[in-house]
From Swiss-Prot:
Positions annotated as active site in the UniProt record: 45, 133
Name of the molecule in the record: 2-dehydro-3-deoxy-phosphogluconate aldolase
Cysteine pairings via disulfide bonds: none
InterPro entries tied to this protein: Aldlse_KDPG_KHG, Aldolase_TIM, KDPG/KHG_AS_1, KDPG/KHG_AS_2
Enzyme Commission identifier(s): 4.1.2.14
Pfam family, one: Aldolase
Complex and partners: Homotrimer.
Site positions per UniProt: Plays a major role in determining the stereoselectivity: 161
GO CC terms, sorted: cytoplasm
Pathway the protein contributes to: Carbohydrate acid metabolism; 2-dehydro-3-deoxy-D-gluconate degradation; D-glyceraldehyde 3-phosphate and pyruvate from 2-dehydro-3-deoxy-D-gluconate: step 2/2
Gene name per UniProt: eda
Compartments in which it is found: Cytoplasm
Organism (species): Dickeya dadantii (strain 3937)
Assigned keywords, A-Z: Carbohydrate metabolism, Cytoplasm, Lyase, Schiff base
Catalysed reactions, as listed in the record: 2-dehydro-3-deoxy-6-phospho-D-gluconate = D-glyceraldehyde 3-phosphate + pyruvate
Length: 213
């Protein structure tokens, strides 16, 4: 972690809402990122669920300097190296493995690994990590479960993701242990497909306003 250019905490505190994005067409990447930034959302998680995801990260990193673009669904050291080379400023994984944790601590961008149990949390802590993704948040018991997991670990911070929506995101943000939340509602698939970037900007503005109210 000594080579990380920035900390996971710095990334997550730039939230408070991180859109979890699935890009199917490369031409959507830059206008979508600009639309989110215009709405006050700068930290973007592009999931590695499609073939063009890495190139989309590269384009956003090059063409939208106000965005803090990272990679989601990073599951192995090879992917971590690939997204780092593409210009990702952080990486998020759905879970954690020792090979991935080792690669992250030796790499140059912060990894925010997913955890759903205390044992997983403690493994990540053994590698020096202090910020984690609580995933899948709602399926794992939601706010009450996260409160229970976070209880013994006063210095650990979280970005809950999974089942988070406009209806419940403020409940998570109210927790002391939560720096930001991740959610897919900010970039609806139909808005992306139709090029309705004004709608994406409006959703971003709404989320930021609600988080800071």
């Amino acid at each position: 972690m000594k080579n990380w250019k920035t900390s996971a905490e710095q990334i997550l505190t730039a939230g408070p809402v991180v859109p979890v994005i699935v890009i199917n067409k490369l031409e959507h990447a830059v206008p979508m990122a600009k639309a989110l930034v215009a709405g006050g959302v700068r930290v973007l998680e592009l999931t590695l669920r499609t073939e063009c995801a890495v190139e989309a990260i590269r384009l956003i990193a090059q063409e939208v300097p106000d965005a803090i673009v990272g990679a989601g669904t990073v599951t192995n050291p090879q992917q971590l190296a690939e997204v780092t080379a593409a210009g990702a400023q952080f990486a998020i994984s759905p879970g954690l493995t020792e090979p991935l944790l080792k690669a992250a601590t030796e790499g140059t961008i912060p990894l925010i690994p997913g955890i759903s149990t205390v044992s997983e949390l403690m493994l990540g802590m053994d590698y020096g990590l202090r910020e984690f993704k609580f995933f899948p948040a709602e399926a794992n018991g939601g706010v009450k479960a996260l409160q229970a997991i976070a209880g013994p670990f006063g210095k650990i911070r979280f970005c809950p993701t999974g089942g988070i929506s406009l209806k419940n995101y403020r409940d998570y943000l109210a927790l002391k242990s939560v720096l930001c939340v991740g959610g897919s509602w900010l970039v609806p698939a139909d808005a992306l497909e139709s090029g309705d970037y004004d709608r994406i900007t409006a959703l971003a503005r709404e989320a930021v306003a609600g988080a800071t109210a």
